Structure formats: C-alpha cells, structure tokens
Amino acid sequence: MKQMILASASPRRRELLQGLGVPFEVMSSDIEEKINTELSAPEIAKELAYQKAKDVSNKLDGDYIVIGADTIVEYNRILGKPKDADEAYQMLKLLSGKIHRVITGFAVIDCRTKKEIVDFEVTNVYFNHLSDEEINRYIETKEPMDKAGAYGIQGKASLFVSKIEGDYFNVVGLPIFKLGVVLRNHFDINLL
C-alpha cells in the first residue's frame, strides 16, 4: 500500500484514521486559511482542503497519497473556529435550537501520478435549545475553542445534539465512508 500522509494537525482526524488501523503519517500544512466569501460553503471547504493537500504534496517526492480536509459549520453564514470565548458564545447561541450544516471538504492527491480528487460531505445537525448557563459552562471547558462552529460533537457538546442526518464522522472532521469510496474507486486503496 502507498504511504498515506494526513495533511492536518487535527487530533480528531488523526484519531479517525487510527481507528481504521491504517498506517499513515501526519504532516501539517503551512497554508493560511483564507475564506473566499464568493464561494458556496461546500466550495470553500473543498478549496481549503485542496490547498492543504497540495501544500503538503508539493513537499514530498515518492509514492505517497496525501489527504487534506477542512470542516466548516454553516447556519446563515460560515462559522469557523471562534477567536475567543465571546465569539464561541455567539456561535453557540446562534446554533441553539436550530438545524445547521456541517460540511467537510477533502482532497486526495497521489504524489507519483499527480491524480487529484476533491469532494465533500454534508451532515445536518439538530441542536437542542441551549440555556446561557449551558453555553457558558461549555465554554469554560475550553473544548469549543479549536473547533468549527465552537463545538465538538464527540465531546461534551454531544449533550446538545438531538439528532443528525448524514455521516457522524463528517461532523467530527473526516467523512470516513466517502473518503473510503474515493480511495477505493480512484486510487485502488482499500481501507479494510
């Protein structure tokens, strides 16, 4: 099997790939994430994922498969990672009692053949109504500070979610099913 490189510093993406038992290395991208507001949310996620994968693939020479990903939360606007506790509060207040979309773009690049596939997955997430106390207590845990939309579904914020429509792992940060299909169908890599 070709050596896989995860072009992401996200511990959640690393854990998801480790859970599959797939050997891989982590090599973070150095790109500055800039959002082009003229693009749709899926196009933004795909573009950022591609930039990360391309940045890392340009540094490699050999038989590598590079996987880049970017997750964004959308409810009337793009919700990235909060800059501070106040912004986290505003994001969680906005999502309270609402249905929002989590979009993860991903890019797979074969460094040897130069083949590139870029795709995305969308999951609808239903949030319960959150009290100010719940929001503030959650922010005090510091859990929301490095996550798009100011929450991590795999952590304490699981208490906020009444249901999802789509891929749970997409909300965590990597659409495992769709990534597996792309790797199998386009790169002849089976994750089993």
UniProtKB/Swiss-Prot annotation:
InterPro entries membership: ITPase-like_fam (IPR029001), Maf-like (IPR003697)
Intrachain disulfide bonds: none
GO cellular component, one term: cytoplasm
Marked site (Important for substrate specificity) residue numbers: 12, 71, 154
Origin superkingdom: Bacteria
Matching CDD domains: Maf (cd00555)
Gene Ontology MF term list: dTTP diphosphatase activity; UTP diphosphatase activity
Group of enzyme by EC: hydrolase
Main function: Nucleoside triphosphate pyrophosphatase that hydrolyzes dTTP and UTP. May have a dual role in cell division arrest and in preventing the incorporation of modified nucleotides into cellular nucleic acids.
NCBIfam families: maf
Designated name of the protein: dTTP/UTP pyrophosphatase
Species of provenance: Alkaliphilus oremlandii (strain OhILAs) (Clostridium oremlandii (strain OhILAs))
